[in-house]
Amino acid sequence: MSVVGLDVGSQSCYIAVARAGGIETIANEFSDRCTPSVISFGSKNRTIGVAAKSQQITHANNTVSNFKRFHGRAFNDPFIQKEKENLSYDLVPMKNGGVGIKVMYMDEEHLFSVEQITAMLLTKLKETAENNLKKPVTDCVISVPSFFTDAERRSVLDAAQIVGLNCLRLMNDMTAVALNYGIYKQDLPSLDEKPRIVVFVDMGHSAFQVSACAFNKGKLKVLGTAFDPFLGGKNFDAKLVEYFCAEFKTKYKLDAKSKIRALLRLYQECEKLKKLMSSNSTDLPLNIECFMNDKDVSGKMNRAQFEELCADLLQKIEVPLYLLMEQTQLKVEDVSAVEIVGGTTRIPAVKEKIAKFFGKDVSTTLNADEAVARGCALQCAILSPAFKVREFSVTDAVPFPISLVWSHDSEDAEGVHEVFSRNHAAPFSKVLTFLRSGPFELEAFYSDPQGVPYPEAKIGRFIVQNVSAQKDGEKSRVKVKVRVNTHGIFTISTASMVEKIPAEENEVSSLEADMDCQNQRPPENPDAEKNIQQDNNEAGTQPQVQTDGHQTSQSPPSPELTSEENKIPDADKANEKKVDQPPEAKKPKIKVVNVELPIEANLVWQLGKDLLNMYIETEGKMIMQDKLEKERNDAKNAVEEYVYEFRDKLCGPYEKFICEQDHQKFLRLLTETENWLYEEGEDQAKQAYVDKLEELMKIGTPIKVRFQEAEERPKIFEELGQRLQHYAKIAADFRNNDEKYNHIDESEMKKVEKSVNEMMEWMNNVMSAQAKKSLDQDPVVCAQEIRAKIKELNNNCEPVVTQPKPKIESPKLERTPNGPSTDKKEEDLDGKNNFSAEPPHQNGECYPNEKSSINMDLD
């Protein structure tokens, strides 16, 4: 069972796997642990990762990157419209209103959704993991930014489903970093001590995230998170690009923004310059050859200029930090350490801002690039039954407050309740109880739309169906379970209606017996029941009060939304009355049944089953096309490689092993094949290359075999000669009555001599025949036949010459009855017996011996 953590970033991805030795970040086919989040579409296939990034400038219109933030968003989203201006590829609306990416693939125009594009990237990551682990990969944990909303998270899960990955958990970036930090710490305070507070700061390519976490031994709790989704490394790159665009326009009269390829080259060079300035404070040059109109451009920048240029971006760093401290009610003195991750935190000015805010040096003990992926792999190992991991509980936080709104049965007013507050623990479930006589609707939304980096505050509409009044006309009690699951997604998981029905006669006796058992319960059970109800109340069993559709804590309890906890004392009093009062006339028995109710969910963003299945089928076809194209290219490369190899060797080691006529003929064929490859054979089917290779091998293979035989044959003949000399010498020693072999029967030794003579004759004949052959002719005997002869000789001779001499048994020595060793043993034995039987003599001492103590007791 595979355990894989995937850090899918806007610019690059990392894969971490769990092995017996621990967590390891694995490399791709280019021996690079960083896989770019880039996909390029061609006329025959698609390329993903490092190969796609190399085509980003030459195939700009069909190379897709920076698409992570498009998940779960509509095409008319203001963020999408703003980002569209800076992209080299086209964004168009889909039929469902989502974002579509238009590219040319297989010489046809295709429209892919963001889920499909992400699925393509996940396909590459899955393939890399499988090649490394040598087994199929299914289960994984995928990272997402902590500010991703329900719609965005559902979209990522759909992408994982398209590629056949079972995402065990969508893990927030900062939570993954915290897990990677805490699980290895041996000096964390115990559970009954004050937790250690650590702040994690992550500035990646496109976003800035911070979180405060409390650590105890084996426990991690996220206290709060804050973020700026629009502040990252690409913003610093954009500042440099703007600066040099203006400079080149003034200096060279070139408008870099007018040509997308020139702009992309400038972005790449500015990113390199930014990284160099992190380690150098001197002036650094920027040079681009043939930038535009065959003109070379150059410029320079130093760290001080860069910091001045990005002053407004650096000021934004403090805002999320202030928000975090305000939300968590922490003081700077409470923070034990500040850990930074993410590539952009390597900028000295960014480090300085963070350190200045907290008044302490930042810590860089975690790998800035791989920390998220490693944390995801650890979480996957914790969830997987295949690995035994140190117990470590992870409690995440809800980033945005979530509320429910519903309509009353008899009134037009609406009821509203905040079921999950900001930074509420997650995953978490709550049970709400409603009084209803018919189906009703619940709508979930984000309570603070201004704080959500998403234009739509609505999460979804949930209709609880099949609700009906009780037979006596009373409203039914409907229990609704709401949950923020492990993925950070809000859902109404279950709904049940409490239905009262008359009990049948055969059930009455069992009901009475149950009531008797309940009345005879020990006093501990009511407390336990009370504790359960308290837990439910802590989990938000109900909003406490309702006033004109709004909930306050000072008003009386809502008649519509009731708490089971509030009803417990009344039920106890009723039971007490029944016990204390004299028996009354029998009333009809009532049976309480919980009926599960269907829930219809209308979510803001969710791919339909038909559309999802279509995407799965499309991805499967593209994977197959990529595989076929790879096999075709491999076959073509094999022909090309064969041509180059033989053309070189025909003028070298193979020259003597082919006659002059065939030599010239084969050289012409190789040249014709090479020309065919670059002309007519440039784009042929796989079978055409296979046939071409077979045609070449018909001539080339015998030449290669003759060369190999000529290299191996003398060595094997030498080995055969050594074996023959060895057995011939043994036979001669036997004839000379050597003591080593005088135990061997003469008839058997004659067999050895016969085998040696026959093999010697065969070898001489073969070597004589081979000497008459030229090197360009097929050999008389091949190396494999000679090896078989050596094996035959060994099988015939070795069992005879290695016969062991028969053992001569020496006469057995008679055992003397009164030997010294025997007397000694008998004395020892008698001594032992005497020690056990006799009582101690010196001052009543007793040796620690069981038998002696028993004897003393008897005395």
Swiss-Prot record:
Q: List the source organism.
A: Bos taurus
Top-rank taxon, per record: Eukaryota
- For the modification Phosphothreonine, the affected residues are 562, 816
Q: Name the InterPro entries for this protein.
A: ATPase_NBD, Heat_shock_70_CS, HSP70_C_sf, HSP70_peptide-bd_sf, Hsp_70_fam, HSPH1_NBD
User: Alphabetically, which GO biological process terms does the record hold?
Assistant: protein folding
Q: Where is this region: Disordered?
A: 515-585, 797-859
Q: What does this protein do?
A: Acts as a nucleotide-exchange factor (NEF) for chaperone proteins HSPA1A and HSPA1B, promoting the release of ADP from HSPA1A/B thereby triggering substrate release. Prevents the aggregation of denatured proteins in cells under severe stress, on which the ATP levels decrease markedly. Inhibits HSPA8/HSC70 ATPase and chaperone activities.
Please state which protein family the record places this protein in: Belongs to the heat shock protein 70 family.
Which Pfam families does the entry link to?
HSP70
Q: Does the keyword Metal-binding apply?
A: no
Mod. after translation = Phosphorylation on Ser-509 may be important for regulation of the HSPA8/HSC70 chaperone activity.
| Molecular function GO terms recorded | adenyl-nucleotide exchange factor activity; ATP binding; ATP-dependent protein folding chaperone
Instruction: State the disulfide connectivity.
Output: none
User: What protein name does the entry list?
Assistant: Heat shock protein 105 kDa
Keywords in alphabetical order, please.
Acetylation, ATP-binding, Cytoplasm, Nucleotide-binding, Phosphoprotein, Stress response
- Known partners and oligomeric status: Interacts with HSPA8/HSC70. Interacts with HSPA1A (via NBD) and HSPA1B (via NBD).
